[in-house]
Amino acid sequence: MISSFHRPTVARVNLQAIKENVASVQKHIPLGVKTYAVVKADAYGHGAVQVSKALLPQVDGYCVSNLDEALQLRQAGIDKEILILGVLLPNELELAVANAITVTIASLDWIALARLEKKECQGLKVHVKVDSGMGRIGLRSSKEVNLLIDSLKELGADVEGIFTHFATADEADDTKFNQQLQFFKKLIAGLEDKPRLVHASNSATSIWHSDTIFNAVRLGIVSYGLNPSGSDLSLPFPLQEALSLESSLVHVKMISAGDTVGYGATYTAKKSEYVGTVPIGYADGWTRNMQGFSVLVDGQFCEIIGRVSMDQLTIRLPKAYPLGTKVTLIGSNQQKNISTTDIANYRNTINYEVLCLLSDRIPRIY
């Protein structure tokens, strides 16, 4: 999907806010802890290359989801460590080694496949993934991890790190969190040759469980100024939301009582009213279920009426505004504000998803 530069819909990304958010977390965690910036999924929709370059002086490395995301950063000139958090199969090893990309290995089956395909790991840097209770990928015992580490070393790999991921670090009830933490600590204690880096702290753990940090953290959603819990838990320090989303009115008209708006004729005017059309729709990640939500025009909340279309939505206006009038979908407009979390709450989802769904069709302005 190409970026649509010839329409007024844009996402503005404040790189300085991202830098300050990361600095706030770094002040909050113990000294000497390494910081990895999580820039997977195009830095949660903010632009992986631009964010990575902005954070280059502040962080020790980056985390991405897959090899393609890692290669994008390398090709952009990012020379610090890049860790792929997902599983990379052995047939892609040569490309990872050639580009000095660190991979995650999460099972003994991976070793069996590498041997079957006669893959050597000379020059490969590895972090071992432990499943402490998330239930996705990872090993479950010290015995398995010891065997994996020995096998990787036989194949020539440098086992630099070991890590896990907490399922409930952003919840008030820390029962599951503590179970996972103790599981991971016990597993680490049973290792014959512990890797140099041990990390379990995502954004939520770094904020609310900073006393449990090992020697590295992975900062994702908090870097972009959002509360990992949505609004369930209070933040110990302020954050600046880094992305705003805006467009403009491209059509304004008056409709009469009884007129309908949008697909399915789901909205019927009860009286004469002004309606404005905004060029953003579900193809941009502004989903169909946003009917009834309000955006900002001239410092006033204006309700989305009718179904959101693929490319456009319609809003009820308090008066006739000129074409080109600014419409704020995320961010501030004359002292009033719409946050990504507000949108997530309306959709009954999480703020992460709202950002990640914003498509490439929306240009990012820095």
From Swiss-Prot:
GO cellular component: cytosol
EC nos: 5.1.1.1
Catalytic activity annotation: L-alanine = D-alanine
Keywords: Isomerase, Pyridoxal phosphate
Active site residues per record: 40, 263
GO molecular function, one term: alanine racemase activity
Cofactor annotation: pyridoxal 5'-phosphate
InterPro entries: Ala_racemase, Ala_racemase/Decarboxylase_C, Ala_racemase_C, Ala_racemase_N, Ala_racemase_pyridoxalP-BS, PLP-binding_barrel
Class of this enzyme: isomerase
Amino-acid positions noted as binding substrate in the UniProt annotation, renumbered to this chain: 136, 310
Any one of the GO BP annotations: peptidoglycan biosynthetic process
List of residues that carry N6-(pyridoxal phosphate)lysine: 40
Pathway(s) the chain acts in: Amino-acid biosynthesis; D-alanine biosynthesis; D-alanine from L-alanine: step 1/1
Function: Catalyzes the interconversion of L-alanine and D-alanine. May also act on other amino acids.
Family, per entry: Belongs to the alanine racemase family.
Name used for this protein in its record: Alanine racemase
Organism: Streptococcus pyogenes serotype M1
Lineage start: Bacteria, Bacillati, Bacillota, Bacilli, Lactobacillales
Gene that encodes the chain: alr
